[in-house]
Amino acid sequence: MRDPLTDCSYNKVYKSLKEFAQNGDNFCKQITSVLQQRANLEISYAKGLQKLAVKLSKALQSTKKNCLSTAWAWASESMKSAADLHQKLGKAIELEAIKPTHQVLSMQEKKRKSLDNEVEKSANLVINNWNQQIKAKKKLMMSTKKHEALFHLIESSKQSMTQKEKQKLLNKLKKSTEKLEKEDESYYQKNMAGYSTRLKWESTLEKCYKSMLELEKERIQLLCNNLNQYSQHISLFGQTLTTCHTQIHCAISKVDVEKDIQALMEETAVLSLENKSELLLADYFEEDPKNPMDKERRKSLIKPKLWRLQKDIEKASRDKEGLEQKLKALASSASFSDAKSQKDAETLMDENSLKLDLLQANSYKLSTVLADLEQRPKPCHPCSNCIFKWKEKEHSHSYVKISRPLLTKRLEKAESKAPAGEQNNPSSSRPGSSVSQGNNQLCKALYTFQARQDDELNLEKGDIVTIHEKKEEGWWFGSLNGKKGHFPAAYVEELPPKAGQA
């Protein structure tokens, strides 16, 4: 069976950081082990410290080169030279470095386990809903098949049955119809619940990612503090360590915690900011032309489902308009706007957009089938290229990949470090680095696009847009009718240079 979690960008982000955290934890434990053994070997210092320096060097070979690892390399050299260190140094290391490190690592391990359990629990909800949808679908398909067989039996035997037999079969058909309606509604509700469980899982991943990132920052700061404590004690051991300590002190003075934290974030950076949510679409018995059913009956069964979807689409569209007005009000009035209200409104907008996209994809799929039955041209919709199928035994399943903004930005620079001119540049408001400058190329809108944020352009099919900059995450920056903003690259096609000159 297809795994609905594999291709999720949130999941990849979280797993990447988790692996990075595990490597950092192992490195921290190796450093702590080295310091503990050094404290135990101070009495027989000369021989024991030499062995320990070798072990520290090996530990450094298996970790990423950065400011901290470079400083610890100098610490290893100082161990080789400091053959006359005494027991007082060992006790100081034990009390001021080893004990606090053990406490921090133990606390972090418990927190990471708690975060993993929370992620696993929400992931199981997504998988369970996915499986429930498939199970409910199979049940509905079987019931529909039996219902159709009973329906055809009644239709074909009307003339040969007595009134009593006919009434008996009609009662049976009525019960079958009621059962079918209940199973259909149950399947529809499970399908609609799919997006909420998916959102909850992705939200949990985002929250746990941020928590784990804070733990990694804490671990890096701990290693830096240990180095500083180590430096202070070494400086007390007299002239015999002066030469060695000058080297290690120089290395430690160059330790830049912010640089290592930035390296951590770059190491776990997202290669692509495009996030695609996979959701199952509702498949029905009457859609498959291989299933035995009269054409008119197929149409009569598909139309109520389309009507139901259209009703939900209209409601979701009204909700979206209301949320857009709320976001505009929050943006324009600072008197009642706050970060939490803005975040809550944006979250609701994301949930509503995902629901609306799912409803429209279901509606497009059914409308295409109905158009084939009525021998009409198939409808056009941007989601047509996002709907896929896979086969499982005697059934085929439809699912849609919906592109959504990735809310977790793993590669962020401090705003205080950015020049004031950059912060006011409209093209820098959307995350992601630029792939190329547009050089004022032109492109033509293939589909209508409704802006969801203030920095986005509204597009109508056929609009000619001037491209100023192309972003690597699938969004371009350009201008239309004097207004500048972002728009999705998938909704336009570039025009050749000659067309632009014409």
UniProtKB/Swiss-Prot annotation:
Q: Which PROSITE patterns match?
A: F_BAR (PS51741), REM_1 (PS51860), SH3 (PS50002)
Sites bearing Phosphoserine, chain numbering:
114, 479
As given in the record, the signal peptide range reads none
What PANTHER family does its record include?
NOSTRIN, ISOFORM H, PROLINE-SERINE-THREONINE PHOSPHATASE INTERACTING PROTEIN 1
* Keywords, sorted A to Z: Cell membrane, Coiled coil, Cytoplasm, Cytoplasmic vesicle, Cytoskeleton, Endocytosis, Membrane, Nucleus, Phosphoprotein, SH3 domain
Q: Which subcellular locations apply to this protein?
A: Cell membrane; Cytoplasmic vesicle; Cytoplasm, Cytoskeleton; Cytoplasm
Gene of this entry: Nostrin
Instruction: Report what the protein is called.
Output: Nostrin
Q: Where is the SH3 domain?
A: 438-497
Record's comment describing the protein's domains: The SH3 domain mediates interaction with NOS3, DNM2 and WASL. The F-BAR domain is necessary for membrane targeting.
Coiled-coil segments on the chain, per record: 160-230, 305-335
Origin organism is: Rattus norvegicus (Rat)
Specify residue ranges for compositional bias: Low complexity: 423-437
Residues annotated as domain F-BAR: 1-260
The record describes the protein's role as: Multivalent adapter protein which may decrease NOS3 activity by inducing its translocation away from the plasma membrane.
